[in-house]
Amino acid sequence: PSQVIRGTASAPTVNVRTIATDGEYADGPARVLLPLLGIYALGTVSLQGFNLVYLRVAQDIGAGDASGLITAIPGIVLGVACFLYGTLGDFIPLRRIVDVGIALIVAGSLLGFAFSSSLVGVIVARALQTLGYQAAASAYMILATAIRDPKKRGLYVGLMCAAFQGGTAIGMLSGGILADINWALLLLIPLAGLACLPIMGRRVPARAHAGRVDIVGLAIFSSLALLLTL
């Protein structure tokens, strides 16, 4: 017999133990969240490594007074991406966002390594990589903060902070080592995140809330954020 539940409906949350037809959290949150965390951590390693050796990079490619752009542009992209993905995650399936992010990481890594002698090539490549790994980070936080169990939610949010700190430390170490070998190898580090894909599979949720993306609003906000940081 059917049951009728009366009362105010609560806001929808992600049930991490629900086995959905699209594979959402089929084996628990760890099979989804930890691979996303790995992708983010490797992106942080590359980012922080470049922040350490950017003057050496500028010297090798003859960037001159434009050397600051090597770190400034990816930093601006990171700030805009944090807001952008957080908003798009309400309307676009997280799986699609993650798929696009992986594609951007691959494109940025290969492009940057191939054109590592060009200032524009390095900047564009690092911007693409930043957009890519931040997609994984945003998807991670959206899913982690939706976990109902407060202890597990706190654990996964804490792991994100640990991944950033660990990625920063390893990035500094990697930058110092690779600066004297070949700093362009820093651009290939995010590719190691591809090893996380078989673990994650297609378990990232493919569902999205109904609604319309305010393209104009996003464009205005992104432009203002860009102007404020320049």
What do the PLM-derived regions correspond to, one by one?
Residues 181-230:
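Hydrophobic transmembrane-helix bundles of small-molecule transporters
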Residues 1-202:
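Transmembrane-helix bundle of Major Facilitator Superfamily
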